[in-house]
Amino acid sequence: MPGPIRNYISLRLGSLSYRLSQGYRQNVESNIRIVTGRDSNDAEVRELTRSIFLTNALNFADLLTLAWRSRNWFARGSQVVYGDWAVVDKALKRGKGVIFVSAHVGCFDFIGQSIHAHGYTLTVVTGRTTSRFVFDGVTWLRGRRGTKMVEPTPSGIRHVIRSLRNNECVVLVADRDFFENGHEVEFFGHKTTLPPGAVRIARDTGAAVIPIFTRRTHSGHEVRIMDPMYIEQTRDVQADVAEGMKRLVPVLEEGISSALEQWVMFQRVWPEVAPDSIRIFPTGSPLESPLLERVAQKLPEIRSSDESAPPRRRGTEEIASGDAADV
């Protein structure tokens, strides 16, 4: 099918999806509202949200064709507007591999295909957020050119570590904590959690972390290859991960802000409702009454010896042992 016709159909379907997908539309509006600081009824928020739905439709259409494109096509269709592929070559000379970290911006599938088309041996970590049938179909399309696709499972992470030790490249996206057990950060000025997997694996393997982003243009795709990051390894794992995330988050913010109208994120990145407090008594128990609550408020608070320590978040200690839930 000719490109203009394919794009026309995709845009129509994207516009229809925007009107019909109320839940996803509200999720996108929530994310955009937090990033821009505007109200959800603001015209800019609505326009950015609509643009994201259109971008998503174009991305899916591209996914159906990218696997059959030639290397020359990727060279003609992409323009590196920041950095250079020489940055990757220099990082690989260290012999410890490269972890590309990206976000769901632009045609993010183009990044993996473009990296592979430039001759780099590549593994992409992708988590399943749809039905198994759809996920397997999309995974097959993404890996058709030879890219190795792995899920964030113990075996998948072991493959990632082996790839890095073989001085190969790995791609992870880090703009949403899909498993909700990541590292707490301040993202666009609001607290949330993001997956620390890339930082933790880089710390343990010595691999370079290179953020990379793409943006759609009328003539193709812009690519931004950011400066490499190296995660220091000390005896304090949590401190190393926290410092690495502190350095990575501003780069993610910059990459997303550069193409906010193409940030194809349909889940809420920031939780809007705080989790329920732990109940002392079962729901409906006669012991759970306003009277007893008032009595409890008057009683002195009992503190344990380690109460001042922050709660331990699952995940930042487990990547090396093969737990992939944080990737």
Label every PLM stretch briefly.
Residues M1-S102, T139, R144-G146, L292-D306, ...:
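Membrane-anchoring hydrophobic helices of lipid-metabolizing enzymes
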Residues R25-N27, R128-R132, K191-P195:
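Active-site metal-coordination segments of metallo-dependent hydrolases
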Residues N27, A86, F110, G137, ...:
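Short Gly/charged-rich anion-binding patches and loops
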Residues N31, D109, D175:
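Acidic active-site catalytic centers that drive phospho-/nucleotidyl reactions
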Residues R38, R46-R50, L92-R94, A117, ...:
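Non-catalytic C-terminal accessory region of glycerolipid acyltransferases
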Residues F60, R69, R94-P154, E180-V185:
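Catalytic core of membrane glycerolipid acyltransferases/transacylases, capturing the structured
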Residues S78-V81, S131, V150-P154, K191-T192, ...:
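A conditional alpha-helix N-cap/helix-loop micro-motif detector
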